[in-house]
Amino acid sequence: MLVTMRLSRSIAVFTLVTYATGLPSLQVIPRGEPQLPLLDPSMTIKEAARKCGDKAQLSCCNRVVKAGDYTSVDEGIGAGLLSNLAGGGSGISSILAFDQCSRLDAQVPVVLLPIQDLLNQHCKQNVACCQKNPGDASSSGVGVSLPCIALGSVA
């Protein structure tokens, strides 16, 4: 009975540790940090809005959560075997989730002075292209709804 209890406890601890180490890391990118990929500092709001296209809205987001983006180095016999089975492994790519976004208007009031309407003057945080009508993936078993994409990631 005592041996069975110790074995069960050992299996539970081992499973918990394996699961916890296989999870992707979550990192919140604070406001002052540079956004990745970096944008051209001379880009105007009109150019950025054109890059987003007609189905997306240019937005300025205060908060970005970055998940994943790490590479694991496995050593020894069987190292990394369980993390690969649990969905981990080497070269997991990152996903940026944008939050607290506000719309950036491309319409600029007409001023007598010729001023550049630079994007970096209107948004010091993270610039993203957000869907005008966010999708709903709740009815689909495989569907994923990504309402915002970093402007630097748009081709």
From Swiss-Prot:
Native source organism of the sequence = Aspergillus fumigatus (strain ATCC MYA-4609 / CBS 101355 / FGSC A1100 / Af293)
Q: Which domain of life is it from?
A: Eukaryota
Which compartment or compartments is the protein found in? Answer: Secreted; Spore wall
Q: What induces it?
A: Primarily expressed in sporulating culture.
Q: What is the purpose of this protein?
A: Aerial growth, conidiation, and dispersal of filamentous fungi in the environment rely upon a capability of their secreting small amphipathic proteins called hydrophobins (HPBs) with low sequence identity. Class I can self-assemble into an outermost layer of rodlet bundles on aerial cell surfaces, conferring cellular hydrophobicity that supports fungal growth, development and dispersal; whereas Class II form highly ordered films at water-air interfaces through intermolecular interactions but contribute nothing to the rodlet structure.
Provide this UniProt record's keywords sorted from A to Z.
Disulfide bond, Secreted, Signal
Disulphide bridges in this chain? C52-C129, C60-C123, C61-C101, C130-C148
**Stretch forming the signal peptide:** 1-22
Q: Which GO terms describe its molecular function?
A: structural constituent of cell wall
Q: What is the name of the protein in this document? A: Class I hydrophobin C
Write out the GO cellular component annotations. Answer: extracellular region; fungal-type cell wall
Family from the record: Belongs to the fungal hydrophobin family.
Q: Transmembrane region positions?
A: none
Q: How does it assemble?
A: Self-assembles to form functional amyloid fibrils called rodlets. Self-assembly into fibrillar rodlets occurs spontaneously at hydrophobic:hydrophilic interfaces and the rodlets further associate laterally to form amphipathic monolayers.
Q: Which InterPro entries match?
A: Hydrophobin
